[in-house]
């Protein structure tokens, strides 16, 4: 069913000023109400006045007029006198469901949806709030929900008879034409300006044999996307489908959209975002109702970020728990270490004083001068009885001088030291062995092993007057043949650091062997050298 165009022609507005006198004589504000009618049809009759009511000084006097056979519109003009100047305010009575209000045209500026321009019960609200208060919030297009004399506000504005106040000067660039151009003109999606209305030719507008005005329902904001269209719009698209042109139109749409989106995708890679790209995105979202897709992407990203934040929080809590466990473990180990240290301190014995070190043996240098000096520094000699067992030699301290003298010399009570040049006084390992001043080793030496710790290794030294016997602790008898009077500085310490005692031996000349017992004449203090 085709809907005919609405042609409205505004006639001359007549303003009549009549003074009003109060009954009680008090001065009140003069309110003048002038009824201005417009003829909506070429064959209009006289206007019939239904009713007229007077409101207070803040609101204009409203009067509703109806015509039975012809469409008429009542316009209320409120004239308020401020001093000597007169100010006219034009209001339009509007309805939404069962609710009634007045549209203040001077405040009805672009885009209008959220502008407070509707006077409802002495309150000025926005058209969107008026639709919600009327219980028509399910209608997403507020221009369809609001009517003037039973005609949708959208149809009146599409016809051009009503527009926003000073729209040519004040425009938000969010308003768009609701007409479709079927004569070949193209409108770019990136154009920020509104499209102009181009009238349809009869050939282009002829759908199913009847001329009609084709309108495309659009939205003022993303929330005004509508799923309902008029019968004429549906008939137009069905005619394109029947003519086999709908596929071609869709392909053109797809190609245009692909090129536009491809260029947009290339441009958004380089920051910052350009203004024209932002306008293009806004138009795409508004025209195609893709605000829900944007919200879906944001909600998905927010959900992902929330999951990541929760995972990071759990990982951080686990790491903090591990750190606390390591700190507690370290504290326990430190406490145990301190306890063990205290126990060890109580169990540690008092250190005993280190034993006195045994004096080192003084090594005399070889040569007659050294031996003479060693002999002359003798002091504190200790006389021993003749025939002392060899086992008692182990108790002789270090640094002593042991001399073997004949019994005739011992009887005199004073030992005679051999001259330094005599071969009978060799220096052996820190011990000086002194012999009598007689012949070289005149007496043979006989060792009696009277203890189990003394071992006689050889008795061949009895035949050689130049053999030297050494007593080493544990007591062992060693023979060193062939040394004779040239023996010097022969000393050897045992692994245990025992005392080394050396004694010269000699054998008597003659066919018979003569033996003699070692007689230790004296032990003299030796000068300690370090």
Curated annotation (Swiss-Prot):
Residues at which Zn(2+) binds: 110, 167, 171, 175
Cross-link Glycyl lysine isopeptide (Lys-Gly) (interchain with G-Cter in SUMO1), where in sequence: 155
Presence of keyword Phosphoprotein: yes
Xref: SUPFAM superfamilies: SAND domain-like
One Gene Ontology MF term: sequence-specific double-stranded DNA binding
InterPro entries noted in UniProt: SAND-like_dom_sf, SAND_dom
Keyword field contains Cytoplasm: yes
Residues noted as binding DNA in the record, renumbered to the chain: 136, 140, 143, 154
Glycyl lysine isopeptide (Lys-Gly) (interchain with G-Cter in SUMO2) cross-link, renumbered residues: 155
Residues in coiled coil: 245-270, 304-344
Matching Pfam families: SAND
Subcellular location(s) of the protein: Nucleus; Cytoplasm
Protein name (Swiss-Prot/TrEMBL): Glucocorticoid modulatory element-binding protein 2
Source organism (scientific name): Mus musculus
Gene coding for it: Gmeb2
């Amino acid at each position: 069913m085709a809907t005919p165009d609405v042609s409205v022609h505004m006639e001359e507005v007549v303003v009549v000023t009549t003074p009003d006198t109060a009954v009680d004589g008090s001065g009140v504000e003069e309110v003048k109400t002038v009824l201005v009618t417009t003829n909506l049809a070429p064959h209009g009759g006289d206007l019939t006045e239904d009713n007229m009511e007077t409101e207070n000084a803040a609101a204009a006097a409203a009067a509703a007029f109806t015509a039975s056979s012809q469409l008429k519109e009542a316009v209320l003009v409120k004239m308020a006198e401020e001093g000597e100047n007169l100010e006219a305010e034009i209001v339009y009575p509007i309805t939404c469901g069962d609710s009634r209000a007045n549209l203040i045209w001077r405040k009805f500026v672009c885009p209008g949806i959220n502008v407070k321009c509707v006077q409802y019960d002495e309150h000025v609200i926005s058209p969107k709030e008026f639709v919600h208060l009327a219980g028509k919030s399910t209608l997403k297009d507020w221009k369809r929900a609001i009517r003037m004399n039973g005609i949708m506000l959208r149809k009146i504005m599409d016809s051009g008879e009503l527009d926003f106040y000073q729209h040519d000067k004040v425009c938000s660039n969010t308003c768009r034409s609701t007409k479709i151009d079927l004569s070949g003109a193209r409108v770019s999606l990136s154009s920020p300006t509104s499209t102009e209305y181009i009238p349809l030719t009869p050939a282009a507008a002829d759908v199913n044999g009847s001329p009609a005005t084709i309108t495309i329902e659009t939205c003022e904001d993303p929330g005004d996307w509508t799923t309902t269209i008029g019968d004429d719009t549906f008939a137009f698209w069905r005619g394109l489908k029947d003519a086999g042109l709908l596929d071609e139109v869709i392909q053109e749409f797809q190609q245009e959209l692909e090129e536009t989106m491809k260029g947009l995708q290339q441009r958004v890679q380089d920051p910052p975002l350009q203004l024209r790209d932002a306008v293009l995105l806004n138009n795409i979202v508004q025209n195609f109702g893709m605000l829900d897709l944007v919200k879906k992407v944001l909600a998905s990203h927010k959900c992902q970020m929330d999951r990541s934040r929760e995972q990071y929080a759990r990982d951080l809590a686990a790491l903090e728990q591990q750190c606390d466990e390591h700190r507690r473990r370290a504290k326990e180990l430190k406490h145990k270490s301190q306890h063990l240290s205290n126990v060890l301190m109580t169990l540690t014995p008092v250190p005993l004083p280190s034993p006195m070190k045994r004096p080192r043996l003084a090594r005399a240098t070889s040569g007659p001068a050294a031996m003479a000096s060693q002999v002359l520094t003798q002091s504190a000699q200790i006389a021993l009885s003749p025939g002392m067992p060899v086992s008692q030699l182990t108790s002789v301290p270090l640094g002593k001088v042991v001399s073997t003298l004949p019994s005739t010399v011992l009887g005199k009570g004073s030992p005679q030291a051999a001259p330094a040049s005599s071969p009978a006084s060799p220096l052996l390992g820190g011990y000086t062995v002194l012999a009598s001043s007689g012949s070289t080793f005149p007496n043979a030496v006989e060792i009696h092993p009277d203890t189990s710790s003394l071992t006689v290794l050889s008795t061949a030294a009895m035949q050689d007057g130049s053999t030297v016997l050494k007593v080493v602790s544990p007591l062992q008898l060693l023979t060193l043949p062939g040394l004779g009077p040239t023996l010097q500085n022969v000393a050897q310490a045992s692994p245990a650091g025992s005392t080394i005692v050396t004694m010269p031996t000699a054998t008597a000349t003659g066919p018979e062997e003569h033996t003699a017992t070692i007689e230790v004449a004296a032990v003299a203090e030796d000068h300690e050298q370090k």
